[in-house]
Amino acid sequence: GVDKMNLLLDDNNFTDEYPSVRDRTIVSLFYATGIRLSELSNLKVQDIDFYNQNIKVTGKRNKERIVPLNQSIVKDLKHYLEKRAEFQSITDTLFLTDKGEKIYNKMVYRIVNKQMSSVLTNKKKSPHVLRHTFATHMLDAGADLNSVKELLGHISIAATQVYTHNTIEKLKKVYKQAHPRA
């Protein structure tokens, strides 16, 4: 749940060294936005709009969408960019390897798996789990399905409905507890 995510992103689990700041920012960005692994790997520094607090994401079939950013991830991104500046990298890719080169999908996957392994007991530990958690937490907190669909970059509502399974189970539980004849 939300508590597990707070535990995962707890500052005490990270140092102020570049790799640690990057890793925390990656996990935090996945949870804050629900973007896909390939979308995160391909982000450019200029895709972040701090003034309007959003990020331009290039999704499947080169479809662009604008995803809002919360205060917490804005703070994380600003701190990360300070650390990233130490590289004076020629690439405009947002996330870099420890050597200052463009990050790649497999490395991002390993980072997320490692961070989740240190805190969570779930069997599955991947960027997609964070995407799923983002969608589930949004729906549980009352976000409408269509808005979540747009945030995730889904073309059809059917693709988004996959994430409502947990929410439906939760509704059944509430119904059984609350309805006089249930």
Sequence positions of predicted segments:
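Conserved catalytic core of the tyrosine transesterase superfamily
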Residues: G1-A182
